[in-house]
Amino acid sequence: MTTSFARNVPLADYTTLGLGGPAARFCSVASTDELIATVRDVDRSGDPLLVLGGGSNLVVADEGFAGTVIQVDSSDLSYTEVDDTVVRVRVDAGMEWDSFVARCVDEGLSGVEALSGIPGRVGATPIQNVGAYGQDISQTVVEVTVYDRAADRTRVLSAAECGFAYRTSIFKGRDRYVVCDVVFELTRSKLSRPIRYAELARSLGVSQGDQVPLADVRDAVLSLRRSKGMVLDPADPDTRSAGSFFTNPILSADEFARFTQRVAEVLGPEVTPPAYPDGDGRVKTSAAWLIERAGFPKGYGTGPVGISTKHTLALTNRGGATTADLLALAREVRAGVARVFGITLVNEPVMIGVTL
């Protein structure tokens, strides 16, 4: 098995932000075996390694990456019937995520329909426990096959071993594991899982908890995402982003009480901030709400970067931007929210060669 490498490949061409300097070496792999063999060879050489999927959740330094970048293009898929209603689907890391979701909807497999339209590839989804519109990966993942670089062997990790939490897992922020494939447990049904997200329920004209045809959910989610610039469109600069740039803060009960008091002081006692129970007494609030009320509306920004005109959480490359430009805006927003509300926002995209 021989993998060919290109040199000084601009990573801007491989990220949805359209930002990032060159990779010293770059290759694509088409199978899990080739992925593991190439990672092993790079590790033995001592070269820094970056494993790349769809580049949709990535912020790369203007200086690029002084090592080897492996783009994962493996795309095999197989089914195992558990019983008459339950199917396990094993999907290679390199398959386009939305192609997988579309296939599930077409074949009457319920469980990922609300995750339609999310850019990127399957291998990235467990890393940050991708979620939207009331569904997330942890609800359907059974196991993840990884190459353990430290032990030089493949391992199969159960969902429990993946350590899933809000937009994170044991994989995020660590380069020990390379995701090879993911197994999802889905339900044979023409109907969706119960609709949990209020905005999606309103769009569908149903109540939360109702089930509707899979295709209806997919169409509604795609429509909602397009309205927010969250479906890639080369003609729309608002889609040239890394999706949501900041995660929604999760606060302890004491932190939320202090935050509520701060909101009353700043915005008035009649203003109630968004609050969603998150277990163990914790409360999740809205990063978008914080950003807008700290003085950063949709469309904020001048020059080549700005906040999307459709979605407050998306920071966009309007054309001709650099990663330094993007980070300057992100830091301005983060500092503004901290100054007004005392909450420090956390970035959702993975940072390569830069920090916020």
Swiss-Prot record:
Keywords: Cell cycle, Cell division, Cell shape, Cell wall biogenesis/degradation, Cytoplasm, FAD, Flavoprotein, NADP, Oxidoreductase, Peptidoglycan synthesis
InterPro entries registered for this protein in UniProt: FAD-bd_PCMH, FAD-bd_PCMH-like_sf, FAD-bd_PCMH_sub1, FAD-bd_PCMH_sub2, MurB, MurB_C, MurB_C_sf, Oxid_FAD_bind_N
Alphabetized Gene3D superfamilies for the sequence: 3.30.465.10, UDP-N-acetylenolpyruvoylglucosamine reductase, C-terminal domain (3.90.78.10), Uridine Diphospho-n-acetylenolpyruvylglucosamine Reductase, domain 2 (3.30.43.10)
Pathway involvement of the protein, from the record: Cell wall biogenesis; peptidoglycan biosynthesis
Pfam families found in the cross-reference section: FAD_binding_4, MurB_C
Cofactor(s) essential for the protein: FAD
Principal location listed in the UniProt entry: cytoplasm
Catalysed reaction, written as an equation: UDP-N-acetyl-alpha-D-muramate + NADP(+) = UDP-N-acetyl-3-O-(1-carboxyvinyl)-alpha-D-glucosamine + NADPH + H(+)
GO CC term, one of those recorded: cytosol
UniProt-listed Enzyme Commission number(s): 1.3.1.98
Keyword Protein transport: no
UniProt-listed GO biological process terms: cell division; cell wall organization; peptidoglycan biosynthetic process; regulation of cell shape
FAD-binding PCMH-type domain segment(s): 19-227
Active site: 167, 244 (proton donor), 348
Keyword Cytoplasm: yes
Location in the cell: Cytoplasm
PROSITE patterns: FAD_PCMH
Superkingdom, natural source: Bacteria
Gene Ontology molecular function: FAD binding; UDP-N-acetylmuramate dehydrogenase activity
PANTHER family hit by this protein: UDP-N-ACETYLENOLPYRUVOYLGLUCOSAMINE REDUCTASE (PTHR21071:SF4)
HAMAP family xref list: MurB (MF_00037)
Family, per entry: Belongs to the MurB family.
Function as written in the Swiss-Prot or TrEMBL entry: Cell wall formation.
UniProt name for this protein: UDP-N-acetylenolpyruvoylglucosamine reductase
